């Protein structure tokens, strides 16, 4: 498996990132473990999840994919994997994400809450790559980044 540097970071990742958005709905935990094991055995070390997965999103299933990935992570050396996950920002129009009890703003409080929740579901003490699923056009990023 070829590898490349992840942006300007010191991380190197497999050329292929294993997406997990259907784990917990279309693909049960047994199926998900089989897929992730085969990917791992093929040299894929880069796995992507999100707090709102699986799809289609629902309040009942919110976070299930991260839970499945977290249980699978316990079967592998954590340092051998690059784990990416995402925070869901506020959507517009017909879809309201069932996240954080309806609090989907990307302010400092919600970002910290989402990170802690993802760490718990993933059963790890760090996330290698944390991204936003949707931007929050109302967020003042200067306020978010201030300690």
Locate the predicted segments by residue.
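Short catalytic/ligand-binding loop motif for oxyanion handling, primarily in non-cytosolic enzymes
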Residues: 25, 54-56, 91-93, 138-139
């Amino acid at each position: 498996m070829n590898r490349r540097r992840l942006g300007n970071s010191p991380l190197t990742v497999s050329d292929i990132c294993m997406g997990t958005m259907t784990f917990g709905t279309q693909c049960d935990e047994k199926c998900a473990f089989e897929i992730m094991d085969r990917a791992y055995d093929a040299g894929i070390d880069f796995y992507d999840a999100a707090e709102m997965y699986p799809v289609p999103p629902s309040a009942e299933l919110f976070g299930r994919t991260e839970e499945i990935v977290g249980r699978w992570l316990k079967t592998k050396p954590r340092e051998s994997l690059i784990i990416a996950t995402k925070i869901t920002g506020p959507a517009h129009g017909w879809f309201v994400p069932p996240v954080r009890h309806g609090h989907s703003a990307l302010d400092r409080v919600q970002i910290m809450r989402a990170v802690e929740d993802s760490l718990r579901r993933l059963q790890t003490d760090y996330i290698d790559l944390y991204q936003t699923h949707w931007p929050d056009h109302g967020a003042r990023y200067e306020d978010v980044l201030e300690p």
